[in-house]
Amino acid sequence: MGKIIFYEDRNFQGRSYECSSDCSDMSTYLSRCHSCRVESGCFVVYDVPNYMGNQFFMRRGEYADYMRMGMSDGIRSCRMVPQYRGPYRMRIYERENFGGQMYDLTDDCDSFVDRYRMSDCQSCHVMDGHWLMYEQPHYRGRIVYFRPGEYRSFRDMGYSNVKFSSVRRIMDLC
């Protein structure tokens, strides 16, 4: 079970809210959120309510100022990443609705272009495990968290101008 403490102001100041599960709208508990401390587990935090917008993966540690991380407006929602110790399986597709080239993944891939000659990934099906997909090769750029499920259109998820290029399994002891 994870535990994260959110603070209204930078450097762990102001009112706080302790969380150990998903939270779709932080404004229910805090008027703003500009720092946090992850005491256990791993979380994905979002800068828009309902798990939308830019995402940041957070493991155990202190995050005193979101501005330094590139988050412009603070945290608005969060998901706890559950512990997982089984096999990892994901199927990626070149086009929306599981169209075009398809590849099965069971491990990290630092470049879809280098490994598969696939220049874009527009949909995926996560069978097992929890994954982070990155906008750029070599695990750089914006991320999107994927848990088991079918993702027919990244555009419909709000990522119309994002071209995903690499993916990594979340294997931390979350």
UniProtKB/Swiss-Prot annotation:
List the GO molecular function terms.
structural constituent of eye lens
Q: Name one Pfam family in it.
A: Crystall
Q: Which segments does the entry list as coiled coil? A: none
Domain Beta/gamma crystallin 'Greek key' as annotated: residue spans = 2-40, 41-82, 88-128, 129-171
From what superkingdom does this record's organism come?
A: Eukaryota
Does the record bear Repressor in its keywords? no
**BP GO annotations:** lens development in camera-type eye; visual perception
Q: Does the keyword tRNA processing apply?
A: no
Q: Which SMART domains match?
A: XTALbg
Record's PROSITE patterns? CRYSTALLIN_BETA_GAMMA
Q: Which UniProt keywords apply?
A: Eye lens protein, Repeat
- Region span, Connecting peptide: 83-87
Q: How does the record describe its quaternary structure? A: Monomer.
Indicate the family of this protein.
Answer: Belongs to the beta/gamma-crystallin family.
Report the protein's function: Crystallins are the dominant structural components of the vertebrate eye lens.
Q: What is known of its domains?
A: Has a two-domain beta-structure, folded into four very similar Greek key motifs.
- In Swiss-Prot or TrEMBL terms, this protein is called Gamma-crystallin M3
